[in-house]
C-alpha cells in the first residue's frame, strides 16, 4: 500500500467518523431497568486509555478506536524469566554500583 492510498483511507475515515454523537451513543439498561445513554468511546476503567488522573472517563484520542483492556494480554505465559546480568550476582552488582557512585 502506497502513501496515496493510505492518505485516501485516512480521509475516508475522517469523513465517516464525524462528530455526530448520536451514532456513538448506545442505550444501556442499569440494574434498576432504567435506560441511559453511554458513549461508546467512553469505556471508563475498562478502557486501555483509562488513567485516574488524566483520563478518568477512558476516552480514546481522536482517530483512535477505544478497546477494552484485557489484563490476560499482559500476563507472561510460560516458564518464569530469570534475569541474567552478565553472570553478575547481587554482591558483584553492589560493588559495581558503589564504584560508579563515587
Curated annotation (Swiss-Prot):
Residues 1-38 are annotated as: Disordered. It is found in: Cytoplasm. The keyword Metal-binding does not apply. Its main location: cytoplasm. Keywords: Cytoplasm. GO terms for cellular component: cytoplasm. Belongs to the AIM4 family. This is Altered inheritance of mitochondria protein 4. It comes from Vanderwaltozyma polyspora (strain ATCC 22028 / DSM 70294 / BCRC 21397 / CBS 2163 / NBRC 10782 / NRRL Y-8283 / UCD 57-17) (Kluyveromyces polysporus).
Amino acid at each position: 500500500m502506497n502513501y496515496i492510498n493510505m492518505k485516501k483511507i485516512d480521509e475516508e475515515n475522517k469523513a465517516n467518523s464525524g462528530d455526530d454523537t448520536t451514532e456513538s451513543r448506545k442505550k444501556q439498561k442499569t440494574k434498576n431497568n432504567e435506560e441511559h445513554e453511554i458513549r461508546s468511546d467512553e469505556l471508563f476503567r475498562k478502557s486501555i486509555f483509562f488513567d485516574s488522573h488524566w483520563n478518568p472517563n477512558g476516552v480514546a484520542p481522536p482517530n483512535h478506536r477505544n478497546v477494552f483492556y484485557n489484563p490476560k494480554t499482559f500476563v507472561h505465559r510460560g516458564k518464569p524469566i530469570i534475569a541474567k546480568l552478565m553472570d553478575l550476582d547481587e554482591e558483584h552488582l553492589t560493588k559495581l554500583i558503589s564504584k560508579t557512585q563515587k
